[in-house]
Amino acid sequence: MQIRWFGHSAFMVEVQGLKLLIDPWISNPLSPTSPQEVANMRPTHILITHDHFDHMGDAVDISKAAGAPIVGTYELTLEVAEKGIPEAQTVPMNIGGTIKLGDGVEVYMTPALHTANRGAPSGFVIATPQGTVYHAGDTGLFRDMELIAELYDIDVAMLPIGSVFTMGPREAAIATQFLRPRRVVPMHYNTFPLIRQDPEDFKARVEAVSRAKVYIMKPGDVLKL
């Protein structure tokens, strides 16, 4: 398994022959690449946590270019269908549901404490034979993160730390305690001035309360498990 960060909340998880693109705002100011270049990587699926511009991002254009189905809440899949994605190229699901993708890969949709234009905000757990990844989407801290940890043994958690619209470093460190991942990657920070944060502050807070290893990635970096 390998996880590539494109800045903000955009990641690609490559595992079991799949390329799962999450929240692809590839045209974000920190991104080292373009939406067309990401489409050329041939993602097999596009997972969207909610429909705010910085998460829906370039999903429709990439889906059209690569032929990749879009996975999201039922309401979100209706929204992308209105933007020209064929219904057959959407995979609707909802919070608490699980879908199977490929060989031994399951995607579980988690709740998130946030807002959305249509439908509900969410996160994703991607459980595979090579490890389990949790992408929290945009969220505040919530105690039921402990339930996610009961259901899944998380190898990597991607958590927002930008504050203002999501958790900040303090809350995300507590989330790390709740989730008990082996590794944690901060996301959703420093993309624009309102969410400017020092990831080293988050790292220090995590190390004070958890055994999780913090990986501060740069846009374009790849984390291999």
From Swiss-Prot:
Matches recorded under Gene3D superfamilies: Ribonuclease Z/Hydroxyacylglutathione hydrolase-like (3.60.15.10)
Keywords: Hydrolase
The keyword Transcription regulation appears for this protein: no
GO molecular function: hydrolase activity
Similarity annotation: Belongs to the UPF0173 family.
PANTHER family, alphabetized: UPF0173 METAL-DEPENDENT HYDROLASE MJ1163 (PTHR43546:SF3), UPF0173 METAL-DEPENDENT HYDROLASE MJ1163-RELATED (PTHR43546)
Protein name, entry field: UPF0173 metal-dependent hydrolase Tneu_1348
